[in-house]
């Protein structure tokens, strides 16, 4: 082989390698596969380390926590630093957490911020990016209740933002009911500071409420729906079910993640397991990887 032929072949191989590499990168998932740990709360209570190991084998990489004990300063029986070390050793991460902020609506600012400080410190120790307001208690499902809520969300959001973290509100079905001619979530979108208060869309509750489609909801606050909860709805009872076993066709309803502003998503199933919570987590991620992941 003469030198010119060698150079041409080497150039061709290099070009093919570059194209192949670019193709591989374009097919590489942008987001880690996340799970809201409430889905496997029974297993986490019994043996959190073994549970995390099993979830990793299934393919889960990132988690959203729940149930931080502010009095004992513990996640699943571990201090934030201990839990972070466990995650690091397993090659896993957390990016968000649901905290008991919904019980603080009528606390004084001092007590509210004291509680919030504990959540912030724990979240920072884990290396999280988001603190999430999980739900609005039933007694506040009214126009006056949402007026108080947006005030509290702004207060909490401003403080959390100053800490270097982000704050988000998680929707339920009642957030799509009308309160003085507007949906509850519309009041939140319009009356909270978008720099302080982001949004976590729970697609199950959007579809169950049946008041607005996910893509139209995202259009109400483009770029602000930073977190997603992905789960399915039983075709008959409308209860939770494993992904792929229910009525939600994500190929038709899933919004554009770029328009949403998506940063993290989490699979979730709050109950109604076909066998048990870990089996359901496996069924859901298997279906997700086959049918939904490519849409995100």
Each model region followed by its residue ranges:
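Structured C-terminal subdomain patch of bacterial secreted/periplasmic proteins
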Residues: 266-273, 281-283
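Acidic-and-aromatic substrate-binding clefts and catalytic sites of carbohydrate-active enzymes
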Residues: 40-46, 66-79, 102-113, 138-147, ...
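Active-site acidic/histidine proton-transfer and metal-coordination neighborhood
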Residues: 10-12, 16, 22, 105-198
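N-terminal pre-domain/capping segments
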Residues: 2-129, 223, 282-296
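A cross-domain feature marking catalytic cores of carbohydrate-active enzymes
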Residues: 35-39, 65-67, 96-101, 133-135, ...
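H/E-rich (His + Asp/Glu) clusters that bind or coordinate divalent metals
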Residues: 246-268
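Acidic/histidine-rich catalytic cores of soluble enzymes
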Residues: 62-63, 160-247, 259
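Alpha-helical scaffolding within the catalytic cores
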Residues: 47-50, 77-83, 114-119, 182-186, ...
């Amino acid at each position: 082989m003469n030198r010119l032929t060698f150079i041409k072949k080497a150039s061709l191989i290099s070009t093919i390698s570059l194209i192949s590499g670019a193709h591989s990168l374009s097919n590489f998932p942008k987001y880690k596969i996340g799970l809201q740990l409430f889905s496997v709360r029974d297993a986490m209570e019994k043996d959190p380390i073994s549970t995390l190991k099993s979830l990793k084998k299934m393919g889960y990489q990132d988690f959203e926590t729940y149930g931080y004990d502010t009095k004992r300063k513990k996640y699943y029986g571990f201090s934030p630093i201990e839990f972070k070390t466990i995650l690091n050793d397993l090659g896993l991460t957390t990016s968000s957490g649901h905290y008991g902020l919904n019980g603080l609506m009528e606390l004084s600012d001092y007590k509210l911020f004291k509680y919030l400080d504990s959540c912030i410190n724990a979240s920072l120790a884990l290396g999280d990016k988001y603190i999430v307001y999980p739900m609005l208690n039933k007694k506040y499902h009214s126009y006056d209740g949402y007026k108080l809520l947006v005030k509290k969300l702004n207060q909490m959001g401003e403080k959390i933002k100053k800490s270097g973290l982000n704050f988000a509100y998680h929707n339920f079905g009642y957030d799509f009911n009308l309160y003085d001619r507007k949906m509850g979530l519309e009041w939140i979108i319009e009356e909270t500071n978008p720099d302080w208060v982001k949004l976590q869309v729970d697609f199950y509750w959007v579809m169950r409420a049946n008041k607005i489609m996910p893509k139209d909801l995202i259009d109400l606050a483009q770029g602000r729906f930073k977190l997603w909860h992905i789960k399915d709805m039983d075709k008959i009872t409308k209860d939770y079910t494993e992904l792929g076993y229910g009525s939600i066709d994500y190929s038709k309803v899933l919004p554009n993640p770029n328009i949403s502003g998506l940063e993290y998503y989490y699979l979730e199933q709050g109950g109604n397991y076909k066998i048990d919570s870990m089996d359901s987590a496996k069924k859901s991620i298997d279906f997700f990887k086959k049918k939904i992941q490519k849409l995100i």
